[in-house]
């Protein structure tokens, strides 16, 4: 194994520790790296589009089984999963296993989008117009990136109506039942 380790993990000092294979980055001895043997995504199981969300979480990650990672890479992947727009929360836990570290990624999916409402002072834009913007997304998991793109369409409509300085604030809270209220 040592000859394999020496050629495969160039730039790392390898050692066996508590039945785990540990690779330490020689450039920064304070940062310990570990071999990832398995990645499990949890939290999507009871969601109507769960399988799609599980794949979205996997696709957002740079870490794959067999990767050697440190905390910096874990944090990057945690942020990447969250930045995908599909999840309102993400946590990464680890478990020691016989072949390395098992990563358990616990995700909290956004709800299924049911309705978007504008809380506005005057009714320049109708709720029917708002529904026409979001109609294709009703009944699907709320993706905050796609949602932001739709808000930009509404802002442009306000500009066309002469309200160029108008701001649409992101929702303070998204209800669990999928109703989003935007403050205008």
Where is each model-derived feature located?
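Periplasmic polypeptide-binding modules associated with outer-membrane biogenesis and secretion
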Residues: 2-184
């Amino acid at each position: 194994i040592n000859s394999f380790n020496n050629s495969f993990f160039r730039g790392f000092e390898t050692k066996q520790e508590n039945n785990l294979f540990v690779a330490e980055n020689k450039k920064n001895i304070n940062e310990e790296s570990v071999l990832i043997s398995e990645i499990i995504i949890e939290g999507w199981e009871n969601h109507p589009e769960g399988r799609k969300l599980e794949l979205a979480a996997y696709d957002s990650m740079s870490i794959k089984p067999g990767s050697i990672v440190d905390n910096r890479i874990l944090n990057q992947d945690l942020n990447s999963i969250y930045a995908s727009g599909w999840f309102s929360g993400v946590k990464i836990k680890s478990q020691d296993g016989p072949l390395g570290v098992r990563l358990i990624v616990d995700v909290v999916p956004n709800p299924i989008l049911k309705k978007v409402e504008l809380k506005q002072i005057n009714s320049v834009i109708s709720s029917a117009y708002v529904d026409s913007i979001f109609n294709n997304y009703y009944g699907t998991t709320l993706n905050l990136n796609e949602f932001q793109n739709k808000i930009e369409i509404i802002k442009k409509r306000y500009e066309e109506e002469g309200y160029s300085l108008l701001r649409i604030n992101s929702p303070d809270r998204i209800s669990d039942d999928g109703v989003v209220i935007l403050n205008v």
